[in-house]
Amino acid sequence: MARYTGSKNRIARRYGVNIFGRARNPLLHKPNPPGVHGARRRKKSDFGLQLEEKQKLKAIYGMLSEKQLVAYYKKALRLEGNTASHFAEMLECRLDNLVYRLKFGHTIFAAQQLVAHGHILVDGKKVDRRSFQVKPGMVISIKEKSRKIKIIAEALDNPARSVPEYLSSDKEHFSGQLLAKPIPEQMPWPIEISLPVICDFLAHST
């Protein structure tokens, strides 16, 4: 899968929040949206607002591609119950995201790299696929040889972040477990997200 290589700071400025949790908050230096007239926010159309909600969600989960987002939505449609909740659950239970939620990486992008480079185990077996769906009861851990990596220890010690209630964390053993399926109200998104708006947008565009 292609990795996003654009400016993450521009994205943070666009939404007015340190959306990726970067150590150097890009808003401290440039608080306005990118562009010559960044300080002036023009009123968006309904389509523009829907599009922005979708783009925010893609950003939160590590700059997912349009194809990936649509695939998750179509899977959610096939499940019984609330489509929006199923959709959010699948995004939240991606391995790279839960590695980030367990504080093994400072950012979602650092977590993606840990997975891709083979530092992560699921139930004791190496999994290097970022989109791997973690199920309740599965244990995520750092490979023993990788536990000396400085950035992992630094991320675990970051007091600014906490582990959400649907995960248990064993910092001493560099591991954590998904306790239950997360619901949208529990997901620690750094910015407000409207799932109904996103699902409505995807329903009319796929």
From Swiss-Prot:
The superkingdom of the source organism is Bacteria
Q: Name one GO cellular component term.
A: small ribosomal subunit
- GO biological process: one example: ribosomal small subunit biogenesis
Mind telling me which SMART domains this protein's record contains?
A: Ribosomal_S4, S4
Tagged with keyword RNA-binding: yes
Question: Which keywords belong to this entry?
Answer: Ribonucleoprotein, Ribosomal protein, RNA-binding, rRNA-binding
Gene3D superfamilies cross-referenced by the UniProt entry? Ribosomal Protein S4 Delta 41, Chain A, domain 1, RNA-binding S4 domain
* Molecular function as annotated in GO: rRNA binding; structural constituent of ribosome
**Residue stretches making up the S4 RNA-binding domain:** 93-156
- Does Ribosomal protein count among this protein's keywords? yes
PANTHER family with a match to the protein in the record: 30S 40S RIBOSOMAL PROTEIN, SMALL RIBOSOMAL SUBUNIT PROTEIN US4M
What job does the chain carry out?
Answer: One of the primary rRNA binding proteins, it binds directly to 16S rRNA where it nucleates assembly of the body of the 30S subunit.
Family the entry assigns: Belongs to the universal ribosomal protein uS4 family.
HAMAP family per the record?
A: Ribosomal_uS4_B
Q: What do we know about how this protein assembles, alone or with others?
A: Part of the 30S ribosomal subunit. Contacts protein S5. The interaction surface between S4 and S5 is involved in control of translational fidelity.
Under what name is this protein listed? Small ribosomal subunit protein uS4
- Per the UniProt entry, what species is this protein from, by scientific name? Protochlamydia amoebophila (strain UWE25)
